[in-house]
């Protein structure tokens, strides 16, 4: 019995060591993330617990015109150490008065931001732009991982245009490659890539799915939703040989925070109707 307990403790320690020697990245659509949600102590506590799992986290559906909620989030993430997390946030994006931001929070002792830009998807007032919320792309330096530099392309796709927007991520990928002479690119977010928004018949016309450079890490069979639906809306796609080799096998998955924290469905849905999707990169 004592030997079995010792073996269990050693395995647990090995798991913690492996986690410490890796870089964990996530995309999380926090439904209607703003002042109301961050003013709720229970919800904000769970959000901070979830985000604290990650070295880089992309947050979507940020509805925070004055960045008050973002400031509260950073204060709570940095409660013990003011340098735990830094952030990069986009301008408000959207074709109508409804706007959202993309927000990246990251650990500066693990990665640093080398550059960022808002992808130019055409003339919005003219009605010929491609995305409802065009990607705000960030290039990271990661000295301690096998891949030293990589870009993250975020997308919260409009449900009614999901297939077309996912296809157009191929053009964003080409633009990032040309702009930064960089092959290692991660595309992630709430693509609405499942159920009625993207069906089996759509996939053959989506270049991001059909082209050889891309590996889709979250499968069509995954469930990234909190409610009783079973939809693989949230995805992580990687391109580039170094980045693809750096992915820890089988590390990409939704994080079911409802089960992890023992929450009721009501409480879980108050946090978000999506689970984060996450992936781990190997250390050098």
Swiss-Prot record:
List the subcellular locations.
Secreted; Zymogen granule; Nucleus envelope
| Keyword Hydrolase in annotation | yes
GO biological process terms, alphabetically, are: apoptotic process; DNA catabolic process; neutrophil activation involved in immune response; regulation of acute inflammatory response; regulation of neutrophil mediated cytotoxicity
Q: What is this protein called?
A: Deoxyribonuclease-1
* Swiss-Prot/TrEMBL keywords: Actin-binding, Apoptosis, Calcium, Cytoplasmic vesicle, Disulfide bond, Endonuclease, Glycoprotein, Hydrolase, Nuclease, Nucleus, Secreted, Signal
Q: Which organism is it from?
A: Sus scrofa
List the disulfide bonds in this chain: 123-126, 195-231
Show which residues constitute the signal peptide: 1-22
Any GO MF annotation of the entry: actin binding
Residues in coiled coil: none
Sugar-modified residues: 40, 128
What's its EC? 3.1.21.1
Example GO CC term: the record gives:
nuclear envelope
What job does this protein perform?
Answer: Serum endocuclease secreted into body fluids by a wide variety of exocrine and endocrine organs. Expressed by non-hematopoietic tissues and preferentially cleaves protein-free DNA. Among other functions, seems to be involved in cell death by apoptosis. Binds specifically to G-actin and blocks actin polymerization. Together with DNASE1L3, plays a key role in degrading neutrophil extracellular traps (NETs). NETs are mainly composed of DNA fibers and are released by neutrophils to bind pathogens during inflammation.
Active site per UniProt: 100, 156
């Amino acid at each position: 019995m004592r030997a079995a307990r010792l073996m269990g403790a050693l395995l647990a320690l090995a798991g913690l060591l492996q986690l410490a020697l890796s870089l964990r990245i996530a995309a999380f659509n926090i439904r209607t993330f703003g002042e109301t949600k961050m003013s709720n102590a229970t919800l904000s506590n769970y959000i901070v617990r979830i985000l604290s799992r990650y070295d880089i986290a992309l947050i979507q559906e940020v509805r925070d015109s004055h960045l008050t909620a973002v400031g509260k989030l950073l204060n709570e993430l940095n409660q013990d150490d003011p340098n735990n997390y830094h952030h990069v946030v986009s301008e408000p994006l959207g074709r109508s008065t409804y706007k959202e931001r993309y927000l990246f929070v990251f650990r500066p002792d693990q990665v640093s931001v080398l550059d960022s830009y808002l992808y130019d998807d055409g003339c919005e007032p003219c009605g010929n732009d491609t995305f409802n919320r065009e990607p705000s792309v960030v290039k990271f330096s990661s000295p301690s991982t096998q891949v030293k530099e990589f870009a993250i392309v975020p997308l919260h796709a409009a449900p009614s245009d999901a297939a077309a927007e996912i296809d157009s991520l191929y053009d964003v990928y080409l633009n990032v490659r040309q702009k930064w002479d960089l092959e290692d690119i991660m595309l992630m977010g709430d693509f609405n890539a499942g159920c009625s928004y993207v069906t089996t018949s759509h996939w053959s016309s989506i270049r991001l799915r059909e082209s050889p450079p891309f590996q889709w890490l979250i499968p069509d069979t995954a469930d990234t939703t909190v409610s009783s639906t079973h939809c693989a809306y949230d995805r992580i796609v990687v391109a580039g040989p170094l980045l693809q080799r750096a992915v820890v096998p089988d590390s990409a998955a939704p994080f079911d925070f409802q089960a992890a924290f023992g929450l009721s469905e009501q409480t879980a849905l108050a946090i978000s109707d999506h689970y984060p999707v996450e992936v781990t990169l190997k250390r050098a």
